[in-house]
Curated annotation (Swiss-Prot):
Extent of the signal sequence: none
GO biological-process terms attached to the record: symbiont-mediated suppression of host innate immune response
Record note on quaternary structure: Homodimer.
Keyword terms, alphabetized: Host-virus interaction, Inhibition of host innate immune response by virus, RNA-binding, Suppressor of RNA silencing, Viral immunoevasion
Lineage: Viruses, Riboviria, Orthornavirae, Kitrinoviricota, Tolucaviricetes
Domain of life: Viruses
Record-linked InterPro entries: Tombusvirus_p19 (IPR004905), VP19_sf (IPR036131)
Coiled-coil residue spans: none
Any GO MF annotation of the entry: RNA binding
Protein name: RNA silencing suppressor p19
Amino acid sequence: MERAIQGSDAREQAYSERWDGGCGGTITPFKLPDESPSLIEWRLHNSEESEDKDNPLGFKESWSFGKVVFKRYLRYDGTEASLHRALGSWERDTVNNAASRFLGFGQIGCTYCIRFRGSCLTISGGSRTLQRLIEMAIRTKRTMLQLTPCEVEGNVSRGSPEGTEAFKEESE
């Protein structure tokens, strides 16, 4: 059985548990292990002398089902190979398998969140809309990772990515 780890974020500690399951296990939606940088690596990359501030080491993403949150940090350098690898970090089947452990007869909240280049996008819905949520998450992840820093700023100032309004209407 996987071990539950409390998150460092106060809200996460109050409302949910973080499951640090191994990649490809039956309990996690992710196929790849967490690749969080060490504190030393993070400091070196984000030092004051660093010339390229828009070159993050990677991105964070999470899936949550009710109060259980699965998180991963994945390396991403913007190359085609890195994009292909990042897009394969989870699949419809792995999300459905992880969700099935927590979905009962009642409706619970399901959420996908991705943070990249200082921008965070969250998509959520009820467990009955999970399949549509997965489709939106796939499109959102692909779009967000392919945006340039200027395009990320533009999308943030517009409020939400294209298509989320229709999803909200369908899930209500």
